[in-house]
Amino acid sequence: MNPLASSAIPAVRERDHVTGSNNPKLTLIEYGDFGCRYCFAASRPVKALLDRFDGLRLVWRHFPVTELHPRADLAAELSELAGLHGKFWEAHSLLLTQHGRFSNDDLLSVARRLELDRAENQAALRERRFRERVLADIEGGRRAGVHATPTFFVDGERLDRPWADLAQIVPARLAAA
């Protein structure tokens, strides 16, 4: 049985948050939730893969599960504001380590650590300036069959095995590329 299932995953877009290779042989797309402990757990092995393999790139798309992680949508919106200042991946790391603690004070603390302007941050979250961007990622994930986080796609195919299996799948796919 193929651990990678076909899906309707959107191609990598200009607005996506991307790290890793500028000339990738393999693309991982992760639908994630900053409040999800499994997304936090997956972040270190995925980072290790990015550090190990030059031909790998990672795309993050938001999929906050607010029923389980209240205010994870606001954390996603904060990361979008950080992205405007070239600090998305720094925000990504900090927000994952919050383990779902996303009170106003928690989010302000993260924004302060990112050296984001306090007034801009407060206005962006109050006005929900990035809500539509986050909702678009969620809708794209739903169309692609995402139901839980983290969900990974390897070159457009959904990984239907535990995310830990990426440690075997990525090297094999890169070797075949």
Regions picked out by a protein language model, each given a short descriptive name:
Residues 1-8:
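N-proximal helix/coil linker or "cap" segments that precede and/or mark the start of modular domains
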Residues 18-19, 102, 125, 159:
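Short clusters of hydrophobic/aromatic residues that line enzyme substrate/ligand-binding pockets
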Residues 9, 31, 38-48, 109-177:
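C-terminal cap of thioredoxin/glutaredoxin-like
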Residues 14-15, 22, 59, 64, ...:
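Glycine-rich, flexible loop/turn motifs
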Residues 8-26, 50-51:
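A short beta-strand-turn-helix
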Residues 23-25, 75, 148-149:
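A structure-centric signal for secondary-structure junctions around beta-strands
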Residues 27-118, 176-177:
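Structural alpha/beta surface segment adjacent to cysteine/selenocysteine redox centers
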Residues 4, 23, 164:
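N-terminal/domain-start segments enriched in small and hydrophobic, helix-friendly residues
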